[in-house]
Each structure stands twice: as structure tokens, then as C-alpha cells.
Amino acid sequence: MNNIAKHAITMAVVVSALFCGTLFAQPIDIQEQLDALRQRLDDVQSDTEGMRNELDELKVEELDWLTKERADEIRVLVREVLADADARNSLAGDGLLGGWSDGFFLASSDGRFKLNIGGLMQQRFLQNFVRSDVQDRWRGGLESTRTRLNFSGHVFDKDTTFLVQAGYGYLDPNAVLPNFRIADRLWDAWIKFKLDGGWSAKLGVFMLPFTRESLVSDEYQLAVDRSLIDYRLGLARSQGVEFTWAGDATRVFLAMSNGSITLRGVPASQTNPTPPWASLQQDVEWSFTARTEFLLEGRWGQFNQFTSPPGSERGMLWGVAVHAQNGERTGRVGLKQDQVGITSDFSFHSDGVTFFASGTFHNQKNLRATIPNGDWVGYVVQASTYMTDKTEYFVRFASGGVLQDSLGNDDVNILTNGINWYLDGQGLKVTSDFGWNFGEISGGANGSPGMANSMLGWRPQIKQSAQWVFRTQLQLAF
């Protein structure tokens, strides 16, 4: 074998070895590369999960930070509002509250003090006609019959309440003198204390607890005003003390006062027919009034007014009252005017319907030396029904007077028909009525006040069926 052959064989062996080594080495390098790539992917995935977790943590921290920041801002705002409210309250008092809740009010935050502010305005048109040959037949015009503010509430605690009604109105609404002036005056002005066992005590000027017509407030009457009978035979206002006991179905009123003015039983009323009177003025030796009411059905609150709106529940009330007073001497030896009276009334309320009836009797002694007695009687019957939700028709008949002709007469017989338009309940109301007297209206005689009353539109009349009155009234109450 020559050298060339040896070199050729050697080259072939080397090439074969290199080829085989390459073939066996290549799979090992690829596997290593794949393993390296897999490791890198695992590292990238791990890094990605780490970054995702970090992002989630950052989001949570950011939301928490925003929530806390918002809460801090709200806290700061609340503190500023409270500080401003405290600053305002410090100017008006300690914790003063105010607003509207069935009327304007001011109150302390602890509830010990409260002042309610209300009012009443009654703008009235009257047209009167009397068939007469000697006096003005037609008489009428506009007037502000009542304009007053009402202040009520409680002081120190809810057991001590008060009411003050002051404004402009007739100084002699009961035609005691008569006095036709409209000027500044008081209506009710009293302080009331709640006692134990359902009792309460009221001191001041108030309506004596006798007839129900008198006890229903001016703004809650059915017609333009109370009946002519009630203004004469009701007891009107006086000053004194009243004890009240209230149960679920029974109420009792007991009053000791300076007496009733309506039958001229209080000498002081001859110069000042509107209480209060000075303590040393002549009024009465003593005066006592008692009234008991029995709630036969319904609620007490139903009978604070004479109407019963559609949808109201049925209610019945019966009341009975007595009154007695002993007059003071007025310089005439042996003449002390005494007076006793009794009344009873029945009220029925239902769904848009009402009915009311009352009867009253008074006896007076020693009006004049030649007139030992005066006997007064009066009857009132009225009813109403709603024609629409805001329109109510009513009718009333009132009759009575004094039985002795020497003191006047008992020939008052007034039939009244009318309409109520409740524009906004009793708060804004228009009332129109027409009354015709089938009898006579006495102007009074021998110390008797008679039955005429200019505030109600009725003038003295000596002829039968000779007088009528038309009245329209706009009422604003709050």
C-alpha cells in the first residue's frame, strides 16, 4: 500500500468520524437549547405573575387611599357645617330650632321651650235690610271683623303651656252696651298647668265652659259667625281659673271667674266690655261654671270644629253645663243681680255630614226694683252636608230671647242658609250666608241688653218678618 492510499484511507476515516460525531452531537445541542428556552419562559412567566401581583396590590392601595381621602374630606365638610350651625345658634340662643309644622314655630333643641306663631284674619262684607219708615232701610259695607296673632307653646317643660291672642276686633262683640268700635284688644290670654290624674289648671282670660258654640274657636264655626242666640245666652269670656279633667270618654270643666257679661251681670263691663278687668272694679261676688261632655262615639278632636269633611269617621257628643253668679252691690241698697243658667247640646258628625242642636235657659233676679225676674230662652239647630270635596251647604235656625215684654221680647226667629268654600281647608275659606228673621229683634229695655248685634249684622226691629242679612267672609288662618 503506497502513501497515497494511506492518506486517502486516513482522510476517509477522519471524515467519517467527524460526520458521525456531528450526527451524535446535534441532538444534544438542540435539547440543551430547548431546555434553556423553557427555563427562560418559566422565568418570564414568573416575572409576569410577580408584576401582576404588584399591580393588583397597587390598585388596592390606590382605592383604599381614595376612600380614606374621600372620608377625610367628608369629615372636614361635616365639621365645617356643624361649626357654622353652632355659630348661627350662638347668635340666636342655645340650640334654637325653627320652621313650619302645622304652623310656624321656634323651639329649643332640648325640647323645654316652644313658641307657636299663628294668626287669623276675617274680612267680612255685610248687607242688611230693615223694612222701616223711620230708619235707613239699606245698610252695609266691608269690615275687618277679626285680625289677630296667636302665640302659644310651652315653657320649662311640656306640662306648662300658654296662649295669647291679641289684635284688632270688636270691643263689644256681645253688644252689651252696645259699642261699635273696632280697636286693639285681647281674646284668650292664659297659662295652663298639667296636673296628676288627668287634671289641668288654667289661669287668665278664657271662654267660660258653657255652650259648645262658644267653645268652638272663631275660625272653626260653620256659618260666618256664631248664632245671635249664643252671643246673648252664651257666657263669653271672663277671667279666672279653670280646672279640667279629661278621660277617654268624659271631660269635666270647672271654672271660677269674675262672671259673665252677656246679660249685663258684670257692672265693670258697662265701661269695658272686654276682659281683663282691674281687680278692684265691680264684677261679681262669686261665679261658678261647670260643664261635662260625654263622647258617645268617635274622637275628641272631631269636635274642635263644626264641619265634618268627607271621609271622616262617625262621632257623637253630648254636653251639659250650669252657671251661677252673685252680683256685687252697685250702690242701690238691696239690689244685687243674681243669675243662674243651664244648657245642653248634642252634636253628630259623619262622612261629610253634621247635625247640632242646643237649648239654653237663664234666670236673672233684681234687674230693676219693679222687675224682679228676667227669663231668657234660646234654641239653635244647624246641619250641613258636603256637595263636593270642597263645597259645603249648611242651614241653621235660631230662636229665643227674653220672656218678659218689659225687658224686650223672645220673638227672634232667624233662618240662615249658606255655603262654605274650603279653598285650603279651614286655613283659607270663603263663607256666604243669607239670614231672614221671621220675628222681631229687641233693642233692649229696662236694663236688658236686647238681641240686636251689629257685628252679626242684625239691627233692632219692631216689625215681624221685616229684616234680612247677607254676609260674605274671607278667612285666612294659620
Question: Where are each of the predicted segments found?
Answer:
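Bacterial N-terminal signal peptides
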Residues: 10-22
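Outer membrane beta-barrel
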Residues: 97-262, 282-299, 306-314, 374-394, ...
